[in-house]
Amino acid sequence: MSQDGVQWCRVWVTMLLLLPSAPVEGGELRLMRSVLISLQRVQAASKTEQEILDLPPGARPALYCSNKCTLRDWCQLWCAYPSNTPTHCLVSNIIVMPTYQETNMGDVLTCHTTRPKDLATNTNITAGKHYVPNPLRVKENLVDGFYNYDLNQCFYTEWSDNDTWFTLDFGQPKSFQHVILYAQVNRNAKKHFNNVQVRVSNVTAVTPPEDFAAYDLFGEFPGEASPGQVVEMKSPKPMCARFVTGHMLHIYLFQVCHIEVF
């Protein structure tokens, strides 16, 4: 493969936090990462459960709440609050990436997310025109590190096949092995997420979307997505690339609700 093309590279090394998160008496470990998020956002999630902390002497709130999250297969985030002297435990299905940047600091909590540290959050993004009748569904929603299963947090393109795409630019080659795309949660997912390709490259950005074929194919989803489907594409080895593109080949309005690259 040419020097400017995609290259295999060494595994990206990071420090991860391991928190006990099985039944309290158990020993299972689960990866958790701390993140700041507004209490209001957590409470507004499509699914959040709250429990009063009723702990025996010497028990740790963090262990209790982590355990509550682990026992729910839909849980993506947990918080013990108030943070200084917690009396409650929140578990939620809200997607919050570890590098999410909270803007509402008035009621901020230190929470713990199950999501991995990724490259898409806060990176540069270009894309086709968004669908004007839905002004909130802009490309920036894909890189803000936050998703609450609300359609207005998705990116929605115009109908033209010249617009059914997005490109992430990391600024320099980065190592990753997974690209994950979230389809919308309703039955129209089959129309708006249909025949999607992901391509990667280190070369100078090309003219989208007609020149995307010059990039290396990372993965593809040839069918129609089901409501809320999470599409994970995985390379057999970690690889290095600067650009990641997503392109729907089916000519219709393209909608993606969340992206992770790690």
Task: Please name every model-derived segment.
Residues 111-173, 184-191, 220:
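Disordered, acidic Ser/Thr/Pro-rich linker "stalks" and the adjacent N-terminal cap
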Residues 50, 163-167, 175-178, 230:
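Intrinsic-disorder/low-complexity, polar/charged segments enriched in Ser/Thr/Lys/Arg/Asp/Glu/Gln
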Residues 77-98, 194-195:
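Disulfide-stabilized extracellular beta-strand modules
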Residues 159-165, 186-262:
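Trp- and acidic/polar-enriched beta-sheet ligand-binding modules for extracellular glycan
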Residues 84-86, 95-97, 132, 172-175, ...:
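Conserved beta-strand elements of beta-rich interaction domains across eukaryotes
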Residues 66, 88, 241-245:
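Short, conserved beta-strand segments of beta-strand-rich sandwich/propeller modules, principally
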Residues 25-38, 95-130, 260-262:
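Extracellular/luminal ectodomains of metazoan preproproteins built from arrays
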Residues 5-76, 155:
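Conserved small-residue hotspots that stabilize compact domain segments
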